[in-house]
């Protein structure tokens, strides 16, 4: 799989830009702040319907414009597909696949499989659990796009349940009775347990498959500085390691029943996959709080490379993007990383200094300057 062409209209700093890319290595060179990352952010958005830099869509639209448009032509197994996304802040995005409008924007998920590593990924190691949950869910959707619907359904249930709990909490706090009716809470408990079990099962399966790839990728990048490991940490007690939906539903239902008083007291849902975490370790120690900057960087990179390797094992050849990675690595780690990714079906690398990129990865070269992209 590779992206043949990318076009942006009113996306970030670009009023209008187009670039024809090549299979294999593509290097985007330019000073910091000229818009290199905006280009790969757009591709990442097509792959995940999410930005790796901001939490909302509004910053993606160029100042003064009403909407942004991303178009990319993706070639997979000899066939080309045009994907178009229109981003309108405050409204549902619109999408097209080929010549046909998509019923929902998320219908484009799976059309472009892409793994992106960026400096922000240091938060996978040092940041809050939400960063690691997002990492798992994005990879889960890349492997099996149907999980986009599972995640959306679960998040909708949590929002509805939180609204009910919040209303009841405020009613009790003010001494009133209006809005304090929790008669429908059991219904939302059932929905949360069912949808949560589906999402939890997917994550557990994913982590089991991903773990050996993380260990190998970290060893390949960091070369003997210790063994990396991952483990899923659910917010509910599971009697035995299981991905059986019925068992997980029962465990979530029991946890919801046991925690109901605390949830009513706090006015929010305290149980479910949205409270889970992915534990990262280096040797016997948790990476968060103990890993050095270099170790944290290498571990974050290993998480992305592990996802990339897992997709390839699944028979998917994703596009791999490395945003400003090589400047953070010493010569040895640069060379080892180049060996790991040199055979990617398509590799996009951004850099401020071209000499930071190992020679074996210097394929098609593009210069980014002044809102324009030119083939060098």
UniProtKB/Swiss-Prot annotation:
GO MF assignments: ATP binding; single-stranded DNA binding
Keywords: ATP-binding, Cytoplasm, DNA damage, DNA repair, DNA replication, DNA-binding, Nucleotide-binding, SOS response
Binding positions (ATP): 30-37
GO biological process per UniProt: DNA replication; DNA synthesis involved in DNA repair; double-strand break repair; SOS response
Pfam families: SMC_N
InterPro entries from the UniProt entry: DNA-binding_RecF (IPR001238), DNA-binding_RecF_CS (IPR018078), P-loop_NTPase (IPR027417), RecF/RecN/SMC_N (IPR003395), RecF_2 (IPR042174)
Annotated GO CC locations: cytoplasm
Annotated localization: Cytoplasm
HAMAP family: RecF
Cross-referenced PANTHER family: DNA REPLICATION AND REPAIR PROTEIN RECF
Function comment: The RecF protein is involved in DNA metabolism; it is required for DNA replication and normal SOS inducibility. RecF binds preferentially to single-stranded, linear DNA. It also seems to bind ATP.
Similarity remark: Belongs to the RecF family.
Name of the protein in its database record: DNA replication and repair protein RecF
Lineage: Bacteria, Bacillati, Actinomycetota, Actinomycetes, Micromonosporales
Originating gene: recF
């Amino acid at each position: 799989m590779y992206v043949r062409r990318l076009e942006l209209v009113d996306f970030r700093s670009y009023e209008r830009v187009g670039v024809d890319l090549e299979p294999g290595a593509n290097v985007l060179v330019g000073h910091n702040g000229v818009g290199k990352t905006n280009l790969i952010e757009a591709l990442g958005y097509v792959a995940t319907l999410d930005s790796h830099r901001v939490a909302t869509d509004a910053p993606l639209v160029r100042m003064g414009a009403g909407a942004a448009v991303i178009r990319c032509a993706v070639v997979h197994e000899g066939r080309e597909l045009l994907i178009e996304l229109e981003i309108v802040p405050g409204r549902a995005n619109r999408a097209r696949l080929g010549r046909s409008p998509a019923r929902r924007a998320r219908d484009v998920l799976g059309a472009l499989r892409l793994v992106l590593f960026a400096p922000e990924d240091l938060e996978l190691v040092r940041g809050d659990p939400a960063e690691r949950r997002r990492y798992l869910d994005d990879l889960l959707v890349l492997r099996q796009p149907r999980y986009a619907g599972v995640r959306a359904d679960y998040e909708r249930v949590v929002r509805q349940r939180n609204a009910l709990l919040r209303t009841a909490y405020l009613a009790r706090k003010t001494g009133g009775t209006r809005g304090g009716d929790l008669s429908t809470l059991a219904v939302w408990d059932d929905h949360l347990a069912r949808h949560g079990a589906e999402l939890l099962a997917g994550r557990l399966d994913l982590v089991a498959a991903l773990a050996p790839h993380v260990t190998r990728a970290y060893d390949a990048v960091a070369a003997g500085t210790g063994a990396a490991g991952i483990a899923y940490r659910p917010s509910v007690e599971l009697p035995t390691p299981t991905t059986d939906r019925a068992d997980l539903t029962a465990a979530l239902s029991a946890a919801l029943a046991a925690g109901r008083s605390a949830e009513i007291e706090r006015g929010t849902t305290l149980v479910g996959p949205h409270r889970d975490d992915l534990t990262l370790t280096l040797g016997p120690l948790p990476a968060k709080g103990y890993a050095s900057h270099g170790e944290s960087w290498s571990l974050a990179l290993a998480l992305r490379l592990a996802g990339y390797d897992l997709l390839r094992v699944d028979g998917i050849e994703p596009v791999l993007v490395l945003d400003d990675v090589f400047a953070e690595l010493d010569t040895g780690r640069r060379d080892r990383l180049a060996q790991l990714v040199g055979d990617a079906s398509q590799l996009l690398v951004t850099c401020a200094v071209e000499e930071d990129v190992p020679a074996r990865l210097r394929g098609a070269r593009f210069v980014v300057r002044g809102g324009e992209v030119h083939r060098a």
